[in-house]
């Protein structure tokens, strides 16, 4: 099972707009410059804040449609969309199974014989809530409801199942989760219905988890339509130090359509395998799959009757990875989220066919290997995927500021690129008046280096008029751009991309000097 995102619907504003249901709600995102001026009028019009850091408000769709032209005319409107519904999809191949069968996956992921740590990095399950009266969660320590949980049997079915795989305790009943001592946090996205999940609640849940501090955020949900606001919430969480783990989807035998949030950058995407350690037919294939974990005929806690049952779907392989990631992070607290991302997937055990592939990514989750895997290079400026991520007034998330400034005119860093998850790194630099600036990238891989002028909107312009210089020679090693002096100082942008067609991941060093 995986929560399914219903097709996106833009809030039409023209004279031929389709009929908007009378009870519909909309999400309005203000521009950064308009936040102070427009917040109070929106609240007075009946809006509620969804994510203050993202400047997102929820209000009746009819009101949003009435206010939108004025907001747009005042350059105050960044995004407007209907608050869409999400719903739990049908369970794939569900069948009753003895509780002992729940343990088959434990040896597969390398935790037999290992002692899990005590409570540490939290796992936030953004889902349909947890049945806190279920035997697995009744009086369980370190179980936190971040908002009210819809009581069973109306709510909590999907979320209870997911959370039980993260951390069902050793309590003498039922199953044992991958990390039985985990700190489990739950954000119930299905309040008021129990089956329908709102986009606004997903955003609230991701934001609440990120605001609580670095941890693992489990998203066993998805859909075929890209949603800018959910993507921004994920980017913000990643910038604040959290690891977002998402289900690849259950359409492997239905043509493998795009699936979000699984296909977003900076999301650890999980497919599902069966008891034979082969990728399950339903598990969605895509270049964005990072690793797989058991997800077929896995016994979980169920809120329907406070019991347990066998379930199948990437919804259930995903929390196994989330719990494992929290275990590894607790045992290796010196890692940041960018390093943990790499550790979890690069330590995976390859499954046929050999090498990285669309079905299994890097392979099967291996907790023992992840605990021992060498720490990779940190990638501290992420997410920095384009100009709008690093501009100070963009409302995006790079918290480290520009590489160079008027006062600091030299810099050096080490970072990492990924052809699928992180193909572009952008940095803001200061070009002082009447001085040349040398930008140098060094890598064992073939990276391309470009420097863009202050008017750049996006580095995807290619060879646009804002390009100040480029070194895109098709070879590994040293790349350099020297920006010629100009009469006045100005801001510019450095772009580093992975060139050629070979290799998925590359580390590089970048220096800026006069």
Regions found by a protein language model. Give the residues of each.
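Acidic, Ser/Thr/Pro-rich low-complexity intrinsically disordered segments
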Residues: 360-361, 372, 408-514
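Active-site core segment of subtilase-fold serine proteases
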Residues: 98-185, 190-191, 201-205, 211-212, ...
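Protease zymogen maturation seam
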Residues: 72-122, 130, 134-136, 383-402, ...
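Structural recognition of the beta-strand scaffold that forms the well-ordered cores
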Residues: 27, 81, 122-125, 176-177, ...
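Substrate-binding/access-modulating region of protease and related hydrolase catalytic domains
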Residues: 186-266, 276-279, 285, 304-318, ...
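Hydrolase catalytic cores
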Residues: 163-166, 185-190, 215, 247, ...
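Autoinhibitory propeptides
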Residues: 18, 36, 40-102
């Amino acid at each position: 099972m995986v929560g399914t995102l219903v097709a996106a619907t833009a809030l039409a504003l023209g004279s031929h707009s389709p009929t908007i249901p009378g009870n519909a709600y909309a999400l309005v995102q203000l521009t950064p410059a308009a936040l102070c001026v427009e917040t109070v009028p929106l609240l007075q019009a009946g809006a509620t804040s969804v994510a203050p850091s993202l400047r997102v408000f929820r209000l009746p769709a009819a009101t949003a449609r009435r206010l939108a032209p004025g907001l747009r005319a005042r350059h105050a409107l960044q995004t407007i969309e209907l608050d869409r519904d999400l719903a739990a999809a049908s369970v794939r191949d569900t069948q009753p199974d003895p509780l002992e069968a729940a343990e088959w996956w434990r040896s597969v992921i390398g935790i037999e014989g290992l002692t899990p740590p005590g409570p540490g990095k939290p796992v936030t399950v953004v889902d349909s809530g947890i049945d806190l009266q279920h035997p697995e969660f009744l009086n369980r320590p370190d179980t936190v409801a971040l908002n009210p949980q819809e009581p069973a049997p109306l709510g909590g079915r999907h979320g209870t199942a997911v959370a039980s795989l993260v951390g069902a305790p050793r309590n003498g009943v039922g199953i044992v989760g991958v990390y039985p001592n985990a700190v489990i946090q739950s954000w119930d996205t299905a309040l008021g219905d129990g089956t329908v999940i709102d986009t606004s609640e997903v955003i609230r849940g991701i934001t609440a988890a990120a605001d609580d501090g670095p941890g693992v955020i489990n998203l066993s949900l998805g859909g075929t339509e890209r949603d800018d606001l959910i993507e921004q919430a994920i980017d913000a969480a990643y910038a604040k130090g959290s690891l977002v783990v998402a289900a690849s989807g259950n359409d492997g035998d239905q043509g493998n359509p795009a699936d979000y949030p699984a296909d977003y950058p900076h999301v650890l995407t999980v497919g599902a395998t069966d008891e034979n350690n082969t990728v399950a037919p339903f598990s969605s294939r895509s270049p964005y799959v990072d690793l797989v974990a058991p997800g077929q005929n896995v016994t979980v806690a169920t809120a329907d009757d406070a019991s347990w049952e066998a379930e199948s779907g990437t919804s259930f392989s995903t929390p196994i990875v989330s719990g494992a990631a929290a275990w590894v992070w607790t045992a290796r607290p010196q890692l940041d989220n960018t390093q943990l991302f790499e550790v979890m997937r690069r330590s995976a055990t390859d499954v046929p066919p050999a090498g990285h592939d669309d079905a299994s990514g890097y392979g099967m989750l291996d907790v023992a290997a992840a605990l021992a895997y060498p720490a990779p290079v940190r990638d501290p400026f992420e997410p920095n995927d384009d100009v709008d991520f690093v501009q100070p007034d963009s409302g995006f998330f790079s918290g480290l500021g520009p590489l160079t400034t008027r006062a600091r005119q030299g810099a050096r860093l080490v970072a990492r690129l990924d052809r699928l998850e992180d193909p572009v790194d952008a940095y803001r630099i200061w070009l002082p008046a009447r001085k040349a600036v040398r930008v140098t990238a060094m890598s064992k891989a073939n990276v391309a280096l470009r420097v863009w002028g202050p008017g750049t909107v996006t580095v995807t312009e290619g060879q646009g008029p804002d390009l100040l210089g480029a070194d895109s020679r098709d070879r590994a090693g040293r790349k350099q751009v020297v920006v010629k002096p100009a009469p006045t100082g100005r801001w510019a942008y450095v772009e580093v991309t992975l060139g050629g067609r070979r290799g998925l991941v590359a580390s590089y060093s970048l220096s800026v000097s006069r």
